[in-house]
C-alpha cells in the first residue's frame, strides 16, 4: 500500500491524432522519495517570456530549485520582494525557501541591488539583469521595483505548474540564461471602470495580482460616472448613500444593485497595489459623466458645506436631474460657475489624492457636448480643476479632450489619447494639440486598447455574446489588434519623446463581476503589456513569435483561477502533470492520476491513455469544468483504475492527445510493497 513517489518527466510529443508519435522533447530521471518530476522541454533559443525582454542569451544546462534552495537578499530593501517570491513558490513546490542574507550557495536564488552597466539606458528604475546558471539564479536591479520585475520573469522561466496553488511534483528547472531587461515606456496601465458596474475591492486586488505579473505598473481607477459614485467622501454622505445605489441596467435589464467602497477599502487596494509595485490613480470624470454626483447633491439643502442652493451645480439636459442607468453619454455636466461645484470637487480631489499612491490625478474631461457647456466654460472648469490638482502636488491627467482650445494646464500634464481616426472624425487633433501644449501623452486608441470591445463581431459572429461593445471595433478586436501597432508612430507628430506610455481601458457597461472583467481583459492586456514594455525593435520578430510566447500563459492563468478568452488566434498548449500523490492500496489504483490544462478544448475532445508500467495500458477519463460563452474551461483531471498483480516498482506513463495540438506525456513511478 504505498503511493506515487517519483514522477520522472513531462514531454511534448510532436503528434496529432492518428499520427505516429515522435518524441521531440522529453526528460526522465529519478528524484528523492516523495518528490516527483515534471521535466520541461530543453531550453529554446528564446524562452517563452512575455513581455519579451530587451536581450536574451541562452546558455548550457539548467538550474534546479530543490529542498536546499534559499532566497538570498543582498540588503533589507530586497526582503519584501524575496518574501513575495517565496510565498509564490512554496505552494507548488512544498519547499521552505528561507530568506537569508550573506553568501549564496548552489541552488540559491539571489536578489540584489546594484548598478549593472547593462542598465544604463534604463531611465525608469524598473530594469533588471537576470543570470541563471546550473548553480544559481541571480537578479540584479537598481531598485526593488526592478527586482520585482525580474521575479516576474523567474516565474515564467519555471514550468507552468509552478502557478498551482497546491503541491505539484516538479522538478522546478530554469534554463541557463542571461537577460537584460527594462521598459520602453515608464507608464503601462490598465483602467478599470467600477462606476458603471460596481466591483469589489477583492476583485480589483485580483486584477492587480494578474496585471502586475506582466509588468503593468498603474491601475487607473474610474470611480465615478453617470451611473454611480463608488468611494465615500467625508462631508458628502449623499455621494454614496444616493450615488451608489445602481449600475448600468438597474432600471430593469439586470437589476444590478450597485455598491461603494469605504475609504478603508480604497486604502487597502492602494496598499495591495503598492506591494505589487503598482500605483493607483483615481479618476472622477468632470465636467461631464457625473450624473451620479448631480443626482446625489442636487437636493442636499441641509449639508452645511453647501450654500443651501445646490441646484446650481446642474448644467445637464434634465433639470431637475434624473437617474439614467443606460449606457448613454453626453447628457450630464457640472456648472463651472457654481461655488457648490467647487466645494464638492475640492473635497473629492483632496481626499482621493491624499489616499492615492500615484503622482497623477485624473480629471476625466471627455464627451461634454457644446450644447451643455461652451468650449470657454468647459476650459474654465478644466483650468480651475487643474490648479487644485497641482496645488496638492499632483500632475493633471485626463482624456485628451482636455488639450482642446482654451485649456491652460501646467507643462507636463498628461493627455490620454483615445479617439481613433474614423471617417470625418480624424481623431488625431487631441494628440497633436496635447504635444503642442507641452503635455505628455498616454496612448489608448480605442481600436487597439479598449478592453470592453468584443473579440469578434459581424454577421453570425458575436464573441462573447453577452459581453462587450463594438463601436470602436466593427468586426471585433482580438489579440492581434492589441499587439500590432506602435504607440510611437500611431499619431503623426506624437513620437516616443512625447509618449509616456500605454493603457488598456476596461469600461464597465457590460461586465458585472470579476469573471466578466477577466474574460474581457485577458489575454489582450498581456499583448498590450508587451507593447508598452518591449522596444519596438525587439518586436520585429512579429506577431507569430508573440503568440508562441503567449500560449503557455493559458495554463498559468487557468492555474491562477483567472478567467480568460481562449482566442483561436493562439495555439493553446496541452500541459499535463502527474498527481503529487497517487495511492496504491493493496495493489489497486483508482482515481486521479494527473492534472491537465487544455484552454479552449472540451474534455470530450481529449483522449488520455495510461501505461501502468506492467505491460498494460488503459484509457484515462478526462473530466472537469466545461467552458461557457463567457468562461474558459477549467483544469481537467485524468483519472484511471488499475490492479497490479504483484508488488514492485512501476514506471507509469500518461499521455493526453487532442485534435490539432501536440500530445503531451507525463511519467510517474509507483511503488507497492506488501
Regions found by a protein language model. Give the residues of each.
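Secretory targeting and sorting signals
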Residues: 1-41
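Contiguous, structured surface segment used for ligand recognition
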Residues: 41-185, 516, 532-560
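Conserved, mostly hydrophobic/aromatic
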Residues: 71, 143, 190, 211, ...
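Feature activates predominantly on carbohydrate-active enzymes
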Residues: 123-332, 340, 350-360
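Hydrophobic faces of well-ordered beta-strands that scaffold small-molecule active sites
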Residues: 188-192, 219-221, 280-284, 361-363, ...
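Active-site neighborhood of glycoside hydrolase catalytic domains
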Residues: 322-413, 419-420, 425-438
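Flexible, acidic glycine-rich loops studded with aromatic residues
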Residues: 401, 408-413, 418-573, 673
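Extracellular/lumenal mature domains of secreted and surface-exposed proteins
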Residues: 572-674
Amino acid at each position: 500500500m504505498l503511493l506515487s513517489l517519483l514522477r520522472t518527466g513531462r514531454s511534448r510529443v510532436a503528434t496529432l491524432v492518428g499520427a505516429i508519435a515522435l518524441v521531440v522533447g522529453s526528460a526522465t530521471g529519478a528524484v528523492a522519495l516523495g518528490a516527483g518530476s515534471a521535466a520541461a522541454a530543453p531550453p529554446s533559443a528564446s524562452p517563452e517570456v512575455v513581455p519579451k525582454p530587451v536581450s536574451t542569451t541562452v546558455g548550457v544546462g539548467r538550474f534546479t530549485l530543490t529542498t536546499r534552495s534559499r532566497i538570498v537578499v543582498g540588503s533589507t530593501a530586497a526582503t519584501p520582494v524575496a518574501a513575495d517570491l517565496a510565498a509564490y513558490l512554496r505552494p507548488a513546490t512544498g519547499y521552505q525557501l528561507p530568506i537569508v542574507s550573506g553568501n549564496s550557495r548552489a541552488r540559491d536564488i539571489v536578489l540584489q541591488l546594484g548598478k549593472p552597466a547593462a542598465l544604463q539606458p534604463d531611465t525608469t528604475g524598473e530594469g533588471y539583469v537576470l543570470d541563471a546558471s546550473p548553480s544559481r539564479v541571480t537578479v540584479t536591479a537598481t531598485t526593488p521595483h526592478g527586482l520585482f520585475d525580474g521575479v516576474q520573469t523567474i516565474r515564467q522561466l519555471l514550468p507552468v505548474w509552478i502557478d498551482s496553488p497546491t503541491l505539484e511534483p516538479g522538478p522546478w528547472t530554469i534554463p541557463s540564461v542571461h537577460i537584460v531587461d527594462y521598459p520602453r515606456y515608464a507608464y503601462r496601465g490598465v483602467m478599470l471602470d467600477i462606476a458603471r458596474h460596481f466591483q469589489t475591492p477583492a476583485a480589483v486586488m485580483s486584477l492587480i495580482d494578474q496585471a502586475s505579473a506582466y509588468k503593468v505598473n498603474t491601475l487607473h481607477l474610474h470611480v465615478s460616472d453617470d451611473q454611480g459614485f463608488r468611494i465615500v467622501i467625508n462631508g458628502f454622505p449623499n455621494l454614496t448613500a444616493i450615488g451608489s445605489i445602481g449600475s448600468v441596467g438597474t432600471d430593469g435589464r439586470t437589476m444590478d444593485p450597485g455598491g461603494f467602497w469605504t475609504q478603508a477599502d480604497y486604502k487597502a487596494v492602494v496598499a495591495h497595489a503598492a506591494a505589487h509595485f503598482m500605483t493607483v490613480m483615481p479618476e472622477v470624470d468632470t465636467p461631464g459623466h457625473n450624473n451620479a454626483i448631480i443626482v446625489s447633491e442636487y437636493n442636499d439643502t441641509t449639508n452645511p458645506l453647501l450654500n443651501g442652493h445646490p441646484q446650481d451645480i446642474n448644467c445637464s439636459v434634465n433639470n431637475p436631474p434624473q437617474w439614467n442607468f443606460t449606457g448613454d453619454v453626453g447628457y450630464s455636466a457640472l456648472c463651472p460657475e457654481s461655488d457648490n461645484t467647487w466645494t464638492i470637487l475640492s473635497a473629492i480631489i483632496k481626499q482621493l489624492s491624499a489616499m492615492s499612491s500615484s503622482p497623477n490625478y485624473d480629471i476625466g474631461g471627455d464627451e461634454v457636448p457644446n450644447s451643455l457647456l461652451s468650449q470657454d466654460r468647459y476650459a474654465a472648469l478644466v483650468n480651475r480643476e487643474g490648479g487644485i490638482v497641482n496645488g496638492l502636488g499632483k500632475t493633471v491627467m485626463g482624456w485628451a479632450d482636455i488639450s482642446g482650445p482654451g485649456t491652460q494646464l501646467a507643462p507636463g500634464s498628461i493627455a490620454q489619447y483615445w479617439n481613433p481616426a474614423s471617417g470625418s472624425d480624424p481623431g488625431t487633433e487631441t494628440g497633436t494639440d496635447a504635444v503642442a501644449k507641452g503635455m505628455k501623452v498616454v496612448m489608448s486608441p480605442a481600436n487597439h486598447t479598449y478592453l470592453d470591445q468584443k473579440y469578434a463581431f459581424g454577421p453570425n459572429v458575436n464573441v462573447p455574446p453577452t459581453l462587450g461593445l463594438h463601436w470602436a471595433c466593427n468586426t471585433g478586436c482580438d489579440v492581434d489588434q492589441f499587439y500590432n501597432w506602435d504607440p510611437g508612430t500611431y499619431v503623426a507628430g506624437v513620437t516616443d519623446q512625447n509618449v509616456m506610455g500605454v493603457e488598456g481601458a476596461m469600461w464597465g457597461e457590460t461586465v458585472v463581476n470579476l469573471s466578466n472583467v477577466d474574460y474581457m481583459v485577458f489575454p489582450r492586456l498581456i499583448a498590450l503589456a508587451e507593447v508598452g514594455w518591449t522596444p519596438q525593435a525587439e518586436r520585429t520578430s512579429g506577431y507569430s513569435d508573440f503568440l508562441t510566447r503567449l500560449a503557455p500563459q493559458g495554463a498559468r492563468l487557468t492555474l491562477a483561477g483567472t478567467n480568460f478568452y481562449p482566442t483561436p488566434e493562439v495555439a493553446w498548449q496541452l500541459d499535463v502533470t502527474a498527481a503529487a500523490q497517487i495511492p496504491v492500496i493493496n495493489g489497486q489504483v483508482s482515481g486521479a492520476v494527473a492534472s491537465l490544462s487544455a484552454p479552449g478544448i472540451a474534455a470530450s475532445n481529449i483522449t488520455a491513455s495510461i501505461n501502468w508500467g506492467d505491460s498494460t495500458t488503459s484509457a484515462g477519463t478526462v473530466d472537469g469544468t466545461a467552458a461557457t460563452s463567457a468562461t474558459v474551461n477549467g483544469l481537467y483531471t485524468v483519472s484511471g483504475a488499475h490492479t497490479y498483480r504483484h508488488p514492485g516498482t512501476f514506471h507509469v506513463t500518461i499521455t493526453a492527445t487532442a485534435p490539432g495540438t501536440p500530445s503531451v506525456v507525463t511519467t510517474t513511478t509507483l511503488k507497492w510493497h506488501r
